Amino acid sequence: MELLPHEKQVVEYEKTIAEFKEKNKENSLLSSSEIQKLDKRLDRLKEKIYSDLTPWERVQICRHPSRPRTVNYIEGMCEEFVELCGDRTFRDDPAVVGGFAKIQGQRFMLIGQEKGCDTKSRMHRNFGMLCPEGFRKALRLAKMAEKFGLPIIFLVDTPGAFPGLTAEERGQGWAIATNLFELARLATPIIVIVIGEGCSGGALGMAIGDVVAMLEHSYYSVISPEGCASILWKDPKKNSDAAAMLKMHGEDLKGFAIVDAVIKEPIGGAHHNPAATYRSVQEYVLQEWVKLKDLPVEELLEKRYQKFRTIGLYETSSESDSEA
């Protein structure tokens, strides 16, 4: 597994403890209580390091090559999954994976953005950058879910919509805008979870829902830290400063009422214990579905509308208040 800079101290300590335990089998150098003390010291070290991460270090965790992707969540959460392909207009976009899913006996339409896990699959998936047909595919499946009365799960993980000339020629902006319009009035519950990168319109085109949650180390932003640094300072190396200023992680976005919940990850990130992450996401999905399933359609749509209508509203003091 690829090591991130802040993980090196933890890994070195783990190796040292493993060596002690191996030698201890032969010579009994340490008692069981002393070994337990070493393990507890390791746990404290992990807690200290991972509770004091900078925003940029959390972006690195979010981008870790071993971080679970949509296809991993499908395998880890679903008892059954039937994939559906194509947008019925141009072609199938491999950057979107969607279909009928069964989770704990309940049927959903699960639609997610997929980056790939190795060089070959990343090229095939276009690194998770959707073309217009990807957004149209997602909308087609969402409307199918509405028709059959199925709740929808959107898994968001993209560095942004594909910015190439061919995508623009096929109406990239129009496809994203259409999704925003149509998803806002879709008469079925929609649960959105940002599992990795949630960047710009590429993320937003599949992130209109009744509840929006994020994994602890995922991010949701109008632009990547590198893109922001290039624009503001003409220096992409200032990505660490940009990551802090963008307020792109769950605790900040929950405070701004942009997301509703932050799902805890295992210590070190989802890639350290994927199975535990799948369980946490599954529990959240089922918990929210129970809250949404019995709402009248009119109330569901009104709450969804008000949720997004109020994002970005703020109050300023009047002149009389400031004079007082």
Curated annotation (Swiss-Prot):
EC code(s) of this entry: 2.1.3.15
Major subcellular location class: cytoplasm
Pathway(s) the chain acts in: Lipid metabolism; malonyl-CoA biosynthesis; malonyl-CoA from acetyl-CoA: step 1/1
Subunit and partners: Acetyl-CoA carboxylase is a heterohexamer composed of biotin carboxyl carrier protein (AccB), biotin carboxylase (AccC) and two subunits each of ACCase subunit alpha (AccA) and ACCase subunit beta (AccD).
PANTHER family: ACETYL-COENZYME A CARBOXYLASE CARBOXYL TRANSFERASE SUBUNIT ALPHA, ACETYL-COENZYME A CARBOXYLASE CARBOXYL TRANSFERASE SUBUNIT ALPHA, CHLOROPLASTIC
Function of the molecule: Component of the acetyl coenzyme A carboxylase (ACC) complex. First, biotin carboxylase catalyzes the carboxylation of biotin on its carrier protein (BCCP) and then the CO(2) group is transferred by the carboxyltransferase to acetyl-CoA to form malonyl-CoA.
The name this protein goes by in its record: Acetyl-coenzyme A carboxylase carboxyl transferase subunit alpha
Species for this entry: Chlamydia trachomatis serovar L2 (strain ATCC VR-902B / DSM 19102 / 434/Bu)
Organism classification: Bacteria, Pseudomonadati, Chlamydiota, Chlamydiia, Chlamydiales
